[in-house]
Amino acid sequence: MKYQAKVIKKYEKLGYYVIDLVVTNKKGIADLLCLKKGEVPLFVEVKDIGDTIKPLQRYRAKELQDLGFESIFDINKKR
């Protein structure tokens, strides 16, 4: 199973409605949008082993945080 699929299952088990943002109008936007009633929307950038966080992705994460959303990086550290 790909790491992103595992991340989706993890957040669904936590009660989130998870949307895979496959195509967006903004480059560098997070991979997943996780929604839960009564909580601030959570954007998750998924990084598998060997992937690196790009400067534009860091910029977009901060941009989302400045708008009041949560934005995190979920990095696979297992080898």
Indicate where each model-derived feature is located.
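Catalytic phosphate/metal-binding cores of nucleic-acid and nucleotide-processing enzymes, i.e., regions
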Residues: 1-79
